[in-house]
Amino acid sequence: MSMPAPKLSKKMMRRAFLVGGLQLGFAGVLAVRMRHLQIDQADQFRLMADENRINVRLISPKRGEIYDRNGITLARNEQSFRITLVEEEADDVKGVLDKLGELITITPEDVEQTFIELKKNAPFLPVTVADRVSWDDVSIVALNAPVLPGITPETGLSRQYPLGSYFTHVVGYVGPVSTRDLEKRDAPDPLLKIPRFQIGKSRLEASFEDHLRGKAGARNIEVNAAGRVMQELDRRESEAGANLKLTIDANLQCYAQARLGEESASAVVMDCKTGELLALTSSPSYDPNKFVRGISHKDYNALLEDKRKPLVSKSVQGAYPHGSTFKMITALAALEAGIIDEKTTVYCPGHLEIAGKKKYCWKRGGHGKVSLEKSLRESCDVFYYDIALKVGIEKIAEVARRFGFGEKHDISMSVENEGLVPSKEWKRRMRDSDWLIGDTANVAIGQGDVLASPLQLAIMTARLATGKMISPKLIADTNAQKNDAEEAGVTLNPAHLKAVRKAMYEVSNARNGTAYRSRVIDEAFRMAGKTGTSQVFTISEAERKKGVTSNEDRDWERRDHALFVCFAPYDDPKIAVSVVVEHGGGGSTTAAPIARDILLQALYNGTPPLTAYPVKDRATISKQQTQFKEILPRLKSGENVET
């Protein structure tokens, strides 16, 4: 039965009104919501939109450069290109890296390192995928930006050491920030969290890290949906690090390093009047640029396994028995104590009986009647055994400390070895045993427990030469370190110092002096010096049975160290030099010629004339000078050296 038309019409109208009301209500709610979104929360969504399209990138500062005393560049920055990845901008990191690998050359190691860095860092921080890429690679990446989301080519600065291995043990090198580097700092600089950001890892690069690094800048950049940089919205420039100027003379440093050759050795050159270090060498060395670029496991293991220890800065880290170079200290202690004077003599039959045992002189037949001058000139051991037992270890140790032994010297090299000046208290504390008179006899001739670095030997020599408390300085006039010379005296009787200096002159200039064969002929530059041989191992009975009777018969590691210290000119000391050749044998045959050559190079400020050398040496020296002229870099003041 059908419903009458009027009733049907009314029912439809009610439904229409209901639907219309619902639609109007929904539209009203929507309008209110739209108003809330568009007006009330407009600023918030505008900020969110900006955050989605604006990235903040830190601007690395230019690292301060390092120069020698004449303005020759030792560490500088070179422009380089790298490819970075921001994880949150890449939809599929593996896919993006695979695509990148199709376009440019990236190694499996690069990819592996990238994933390691991504795990360690926030997703919004850029991670370096490939460093030191070519300009062609940069262009290819830029052109393919739409298919490489999160990938950005960047320009940066890389550290370069123009003089390579010549300055490794002074300047050091930089390398990527490690977890350990961050842990050592309470509030790390944000720069240090940039993946593969490089900081000083050794020597001056590390000691002056805060001085050299500078301060970060920042830039706000706008990117499109594909991650391509559209424009730079804002920029705050970085502040470059401060430069560092050294007292080292690059020409002399290169010569000294070359003169050491393949020896495991060190040489230190000091200005006697100011304490400025003119050369600070250690051999063998290595190329620091390899560490900046990423040294291979093979190359690094080769350095670790080299028995000559190229990673050790021997000039400051080495600690060696002084050998006979310590005899000047023993002599001064006896003079100051009034035990001897210049005319005192001791008879040397070739040995001295101490506590029921014979202590031998190096000259088994003996030196006969020995004065102070003769004792140093011919390096008689018995003379020093005798006077040391009378003066005692405490007085000897006191004088040794006045000449810079047993302490570190502030030259901003954190690896410096303080050496050792033993005493009765030291032996009780360290070995829980009493001091014996045999210990005193050993120390008197620079054997036993007394140890020094080549730097300390140079300091002693400069103080002996001048009578002043000269302290070493490696940093020239900068805000980083004050460079005033020490003028205080060593508080010893000037007559005693004069007597020791005169004996050192005889060592190098008297026919029976131990360094006579390495003398300087030029009257204006006559040197005073002292040879030393420090025993590493005594020849055992087992070795003697095998026919080992001399140093040369032994394995290299068991041979004695060779030492020589000197200063010149004798009448007006300007330069002090110390040389230590590990396992080099006698100081007179190995260390003295090297020290003499370096000393003359410093005094002449370049290649000395052949007439400065003994006639017997001139042919060898001429050949050596020609060879060095070919291999040494030619350096001029203010020059940027190309490798």
Predicted features and spans:
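Periplasmic/cell-envelope proteins involved in peptidoglycan metabolism and beta-lactam response
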Residues: M1-H297, K307, A319, D341, ...
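Beta-lactam-recognizing serine transpeptidase/beta-lactamase-like catalytic domain environment
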Residues: M3-P6, V223-L233, A265, K273-T325, ...
